[in-house]
Amino acid sequence: MPAMPSGYFLAIAGNIGVGKTELTDRLARELGWYAYYEPVIQNPYLDDFYKDMSRWAFHLQIYFLSERFKAQVTIGDAADAFIQDRTIYEDRWIFARTLHEQGDMSKVDYENYTALFDILAGFLRKPDLILYLKASPETLMERIARRGRESEKSITIEYLRRLGRAYDEWIEQARGEFEVEVVDTDQVPLQGPTAAFHDLVEELKRRYPPQVPLPLPPARPR
């Protein structure tokens, strides 16, 4: 098991298009923390996945599992504070599960994936806090359309609904393992210089006061 680090670890969770990356970026700048972003742009499978989920579901999930494991190992080894855009736990409990349940990941692939996840997760430091952002499927569709990623044009509202149901079930389960805060972004706007964003920053500063900066550990060989 990893040694107990001294830096803070905040994870931002939530459905596609809910605003995780923007919030991660803004909080990192406001708090002076390091940010780890979801590896979307570099993902070699994402475009193909949205065209043919059944063909690429397992490949995509293994890629995300690998990348997020490496990121979380780095976070666990460091003494500085980090914010992570989407957690490794969402890969397992939201995306892989939903893809399997809707028939896009076979039983054998799903079982192999979950077995690998269970092994890897045991080596990881858990977040100090998971901030779960939620929004209605209609809001998510609007935000996805607004950011205009070519690979996301085929996302359906029904897929977002399925993911949302999986998120709601997982969050109830996760409360027994992690500290969790839920923000309904339809009701509590965090985009832009809102009072809600200011209040969130102040609350995080209160809960996680600044630490004396320490150097990051050397990069792990890849």
What label would you give each PLM region?
Residues 12:
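Hydrophobic anchor at the beta1->P-loop junction of P-loop NTPases
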